């Protein structure tokens, strides 16, 4: 018997279900009862109960796409902070070069990279790689850190939430599965985007978040609420600003657990020789032309009317 509802906020030791249900992430079984291990939100999938913690550290998984900052240059590899208890390692073989001097000429300390987790061994040694579309070095921008389990809420269903933030601030935004968010735009818009991202992180477990985010964005960017009015003669429509660097959003899972596939993170650019990330322009889709109406039936009707009149 299920004793809680989907997305209920629970505390450690709280009984979630009995008998026919199975324990999942963030839970433990005691006798025939399934209990929560964390303060978090309930997620039920096929009789399996999970608790998604409100606060957690990023645990690397093979295939994850993450944002990391170089903190150390070692012999034949770079060490990176990936917002995790475990340090990420980028071998020189994943880029090029053999000695420390060559490594520094490619990436230096405090450089920020978009990488893929290649492997995680039994002692949590995290090997990173740059082979893949869109992976490489970021130029400028700011970093914002959020709880990794709240990444799907920031992204939203089919990228709806993150797209709204990008459209209203005209910023390029890339979200790593490790809870690191890269933002680049005009300085004032970067600060607005940062404030909104942190708000989503704080209030991810609450209802009505999308409407509150939209209202905050409109207020901070100075956009008035849309009001339906009749246009008078001589009134010019304001031009809609277009962002040349607007990036195409990928589809994201609504579930809290992020799939490790590359489609679960926004692409930044095609892989270039200097491994630097650049924004891509989004090609506007053309509208599908409407099908032409068949005039055959109308023609037949006219012939019948003429025959009737002759009679």
From Swiss-Prot:
Keywords: Cytoplasm, Exosome, RNA-binding. Residues 241-300 have a biased composition (Acidic residues). It holds the Pfam family ECR1_N_2. GO terms for biological process: CUT catabolic process; exonucleolytic trimming to generate mature 3'-end of 5.8S rRNA from tricistronic rRNA transcript (SSU-rRNA, 5.8S rRNA, LSU-rRNA); poly(A)-dependent snoRNA 3'-end processing; RNA catabolic process; U4 snRNA 3'-end processing. Its main location: cytoplasm. InterPro entries: Exosome_RNA_bind1/RRP40/RRP4, KH_dom, KH_dom_type_1, KH_dom_type_1_sf, NA-bd_OB-fold, Rrp4, RRP4_N, RRP4_S1. Residues 139-197 form the KH domain. GO terms for cellular component: cytoplasm; exosome (RNase complex). It comes from the Archaea. One of its GO terms (molecular function) is poly(A) binding. Residues 222-311 are annotated as: Disordered. CDD domains: KH-I_Rrp4_prokar, S1_Rrp4. The keyword Transcription does not apply. It is found in: Cytoplasm. Gene3D superfamilies: 2.40.50.100, K Homology domain, type 1 (3.30.1370.10), Nucleic acid-binding proteins (2.40.50.140). Residues 301-311 have a biased composition (Basic and acidic residues). Residues 63-131 form the S1 motif domain. Non-catalytic component of the exosome, which is a complex involved in RNA degradation. Increases the RNA binding and the efficiency of RNA degradation. Confers strong poly(A) specificity to the exosome. Belongs to the RRP4 family. Component of the archaeal exosome complex. Forms a trimer of Rrp4 and/or Csl4 subunits. The trimer associates with a hexameric ring-like arrangement composed of 3 Rrp41-Rrp42 heterodimers. This is Exosome complex component Rrp4. It comes from Methanothermobacter thermautotrophicus (strain ATCC 29096 / DSM 1053 / JCM 10044 / NBRC 100330 / Delta H) (Methanobacterium thermoautotrophicum). The gene is rrp4.
């Amino acid at each position: 018997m299920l004793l809680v509802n989907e997305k209920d906020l629970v505390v450690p030791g709280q009984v979630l279900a009995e008998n026919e249900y199975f324990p999942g992430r963030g839970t433990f079984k005691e006798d025939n009862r399934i209990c929560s291990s964390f303060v978090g939100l309930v997620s039920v999938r096929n009789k399996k109960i999970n608790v998604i913690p409100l606060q957690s550290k990023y645990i690397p998984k093979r295939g994850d796409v993450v944002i990391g900052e170089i903190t150390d240059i070692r012999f034949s590899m770079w060490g990176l902070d990936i917002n995790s208890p475990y340090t990420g390692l980028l071998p020189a073989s994943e880029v090029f070069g053999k000695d420390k001097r060559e490594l520094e000429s490619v990436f230096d300390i405090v450089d920020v990279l978009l990488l893929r987790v290649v492997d995680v061994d039994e002692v949590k040694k995290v090997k990173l790689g740059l082979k893949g579309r869109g992976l490489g070095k970021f130029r400028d921008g700011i970093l914002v850190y959020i709880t990794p389990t709240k990444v799907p809420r920031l992204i939203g269903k089919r990228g709806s939430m993150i797209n709204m933030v990008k459209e209203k601030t005209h910023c390029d935004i890339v979200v790593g599965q490790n809870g690191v968010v890269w933002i680049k735009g005009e300085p004032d818009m970067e600060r607005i985007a940062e404030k909104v991202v942190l708000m989503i992180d704080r209030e991810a477990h609450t209802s009505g978040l999308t409407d509150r985010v939209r209202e905050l964005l409109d207020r901070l960017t100075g956009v008035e609420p849309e009001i339906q009015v009749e246009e008078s003669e001589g009134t010019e429509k304001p031009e809609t600003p277009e962002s040349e660097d607007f990036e195409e959003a990928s589809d994201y899972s609504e579930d809290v657990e992020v799939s490790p596939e590359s489609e679960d993170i926004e692409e930044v650019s095609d892989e270039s020789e200097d491994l630097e990330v650049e924004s891509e322009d989004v090609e506007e889709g053309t509208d599908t032309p409407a099908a032409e109406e068949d005039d055959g039936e109308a023609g037949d009707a006219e012939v019948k009317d003429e025959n009737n009149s002759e009679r």
